[in-house]
Every structure is written in structure tokens, then in C-alpha cells.
Amino acid sequence: MGFSHITHLDLKRFAGLSQRTSNALEMTEERRIPALWDQLWKQDMSALLSQAEKDKSIIALYSNYEQETNGFYTFSVGTFQEYDDILPGPYENIDLPASAYAVFTSRIGPIEEIVLETWKEIWTWDKRHLRTFTGDFEMYDQNAAVPQRAQVNIYVAIKK
């Protein structure tokens, strides 16, 4: 599907598990993102989800970029929280600044395919020069509940 629309989101507080990685590292056997997802599912997630609505989305957050798409960044998996909630370790609390976001919607398909396909589209998007690299995220809501027939939205921070 691809680019959907532009939206503005206020400051958000994220809580989750984090790991430093890079796109180059994620293309090797040393990739870290799959292990972080595994770690999240093995955790007692009640602290993350206890204050949530029943349909709280899981968020994959990309933040603290070193050199835009070429350097290291922090990859985190967790949820958005109420701003005054700070969760204790092992969860990292990250504030995502208010920003305009370009929203990209994946096609429906196997989750391991559609997410990378959508990121490849973002990397070649004709307005990619507008990216601010202040924090981007993938939203896994009820549309991603069936891994073989998933659809996700990816929010990319941009200059307005």
C-alpha cells in the first residue's frame, strides 16, 4: 500500500526493552531485533499492559539515530504509556517528542515480509529528505494479530 497520510502526534512516553543496532548489523547473523522480540514475549508484560486499554498496541520504536539510516540507533519494543507513568527496569522509558509523521501502511501479508517491504519503500520515498530521525515507530494493533495476514502502520517523523 505505502504512504497513507500525514498526522501530528503530541509528546508520547514509551516503555519497553531496548537494544542498540544498525541496518547493516540487522542484515547479518549478528542481528539483534529478533532476539529482542523474543525477550519481550518471554517477559511478564503485565507491567507494560496493566494500565492499558484492552486493545493497547505493541510498538517497535526507532530512536537515538547516530547517522540517519547509516549508523546505529536504539530499537525498542514495548507500548506507549500515560506520560506520568515511569516503569522500573528492565524497561527503558523514552520520551518521543511531538512531531508531524508520515504514516505508511503495509499490505496484508506475512509479518516478516511486510515490515521490511514497507521500510524499503520508506528508504526510497521521494520525500525522505523530510525525515527528522527524532523517533519513528511501527504500530502492531489488532490488524497484526494474525502473523500470516498482518498489516502494520509505520510512523516516520518528518519536518512539517
UniProtKB/Swiss-Prot annotation:
Pfam families: GyrI-like. Transmembrane segments: none annotated. SUPFAM superfamilies: Probable bacterial effector-binding domain (SSF55136). InterPro entries: AraC_E-bd, GyrI-like, Reg_factor_effector_dom_sf, YobU-like_regulator. Disulfide bonds: none annotated. PANTHER family: TRANSCRIPTIONAL REGULATOR PROTEIN YOBU-RELATED. This is Putative transcriptional regulator protein YobU. It comes from Bacillus subtilis (strain 168).
